[in-house]
Design a protein with these regions (language model features):
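Short, low-complexity N-terminal regulatory "tails/caps" that precede and couple sensory modules
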Residues: 1-33
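Short charge-dense sequence patches
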Residues: 24-31, 37, 51-59
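Short loop/turn hinge sites at secondary-structure boundaries
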Residues: 28-30, 41, 111
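Acidic, metal-coordinating catalytic segment for phosphate/diphosphate chemistry
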Residues: 35-45
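Sensory/regulatory domains in signal-transduction proteins
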Residues: 43-159
């Protein structure tokens, strides 16, 4: 499902910066090749939004809301930007998988990041898919305070 790119706004550019810098901090490697000093924020946001694998982020709180999903995530979940952003992130997984998902998120929060997570997710239309070898990492703001978590994966298939 096509969606307008959500990267042009200043706040989305800042969120993209947090996603990329936090990924670099957690895994000692860039999430995308263009996340290099000297590239414009707008260009980096375009590349993150258009990269070929899903990237999502949610905020903090007891039932965190999705803050970001790139084009690959929007297509996989079958949602438009305005449907995905603001949705409780727990709804990306089937109800019976949410406890396992929360355990992984808690582990990633405790360790700052994890890799190798696998689980079941569910699209807007109810279609289930498996994800494998996902990376989950903590988002850190300029004051070194946790402001959310992000995840990405490139290995998935319909169940």
């Amino acid at each position: 499902m096509a969606s307008e790119a959500a990267w042009p706004t200043t706040d989305k550019q800042e969120l993209a910066r947090l996603l990329l810098e936090s990924h670099q901090r957690a895994f000692s490697r860039p999430l995308i090749a263009s996340a290099q000093p000297g590239h414009s924020k707008r260009l980096i946001c375009q590349h993150l939004f258009a990269c070929g694998f899903p990237v999502l982020a949610h905020g903090t709180g007891s039932d965190p809301l999705i803050l970001y999903g790139n084009s690959a995530a929007l297509q996989l979940w079958g949602l438009r930007w305005e449907q995905l952003v603001g949705m409780p992130s727990r709804l990306t997984a089937p109800e019976e998988e949410r406890s396992e998902r929360q355990t992984a998120l808690t582990e990633a929060q405790t360790k700052e990041a994890i890799r190798g997570y696998s689980g079941t997710r569910i699209s807007q239309g109810g279609r289930r898919f498996q994800i494998r070898d996902a990376r989950i990492w903590t988002l850190w703001n300029e004051d070194n305070l946790c402001c959310g978590q992000a995840a990405c994966f490139s290995d998935w298939w319909w169940s």
